[in-house]
Amino acid sequence: MKFLPSLEEVKKIAHEQIYNVLPVSTEMLSDFTTPIEVMRVLKNVSSHCFMLESAQADEKWGRYTFIGFEPKMEITCIDGILNLGDITVNTNQPSKYLRQILANYKSPRFDYLPSFTGGLVGYFSYDYITYSEPSAKRETENNEAFKDVDLMLFDKVIAFDSVKQKIILMANIHLENYEVEYNRAVNELKQLAELLHNGEKIKEKSGKLLGDVKPYFNKEQYCEMVEKAKNYIREGDIFQIVLSNRLSANFEGSLFNTYRVLRTLNPSPYMFYFSGTDVEVAGASPETLVKLENGVLRTFPLAGTRPRGKTEEEDKLLEKELLADEKELAEHNMLVDLGRNDLGRISKFGTVEVEKLHSIERYSHVMHIGSTVRGIIREDKDALDAIEAVLPAGTLSGAPKIRACQLIGELENNKRGIYGGAIGYIDFTGNMDTCIAIRIAYKKNGKVFVRSGAGIVADSVPEKEFEECLNKAKSCLKALEIAQEVD
């Protein structure tokens, strides 16, 4: 096996004293297994794991699948109580401690490696806004004790390269004692290669729904909530607000098979499976929250929807109709402005621009109007600042954002948790890629939850908005149903 970089190259980087970690890597052919099979092997070793995949708008599978297991630590925060492995701290600034952790893991980028080589993986919940904007906080019911943050630190990563048909194994080393660390990483990677070839796969029961799926708000309650929101809109408090409803059912077993089904039912730019201490998440989200790559910030507002046509001709007619819909365009433009304002808070003056406006993005079942907003991050800001500036997305809150969040707390009166938050990674090079936590199923305390929302404006019809929430939940509910029969 060949290992990169060489020990001589590591020595040189260590002596420069710019970085304190770097990834040692090796490669193997991938023709003997699949990412799903590898996950089954790793889940037998560690219940704490993740899988990140991608499918493009034309349903072509993305190049890389990232897998991690055996995290160095799990970091959670709920209502200002931060757990860093075995340490507990009271804080109203979780990002301060996350920054301290990441400061111990500053890595160079290597052109021969994929975009993610190790870092923090997990989620920032919708309610994380209360740390950066305390005025948005409202006392809401949280019987399920949903965390505000749940991240795991992975210094070992497996990447499947679907183009070159190979697996890249990566283990990060600390440069302080680089020779000992290098030898440790080489041995670790050899053992990992052996595990992938010969490891035993987990024998897991398919997840089972126990009883009916029930909404948090029945139709009458949800419609009443919509009418209250429309009053706030008429009074000029807000222009738009996104009101959500939560579906839940008792559940036993794992969500891994649900993820396997969901990725085939709903191929999406962001597909993820995440298993922590007390939560499991399976999702397929179409929408980026915020991305930071080599100092460039991007957010991709996505709003305005039509179903996909049965033929290319019908697709083009629906595209034309969507781009001529003034109401859809007005709503989309409001979100583009919100994206510019959000990035403007952390970007260098004069660098925020709309890179792409009103393009049609096609997905497996629907098409959306998409735009791209770009900015250059300021030297004194980082990925954590970007998350605080953008979370939650306007498509999951409303406009103006802070007032919409305050009213969501009052009207919904139950903690959203993961839904509407950010799922993804912050890596050891300072880059970040996060999606909006929608089209997800998550399991906690013997229950499974699926949540979805509808954008409320002045002329919204409450009954239609209730139905829209149910329609948006369909792909996850269908995946839960089908997964019960999957081996």
Q: What name fits each language-model region?
A:
Residues 1-487:
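Extended alpha-helical targeting/anchoring segments
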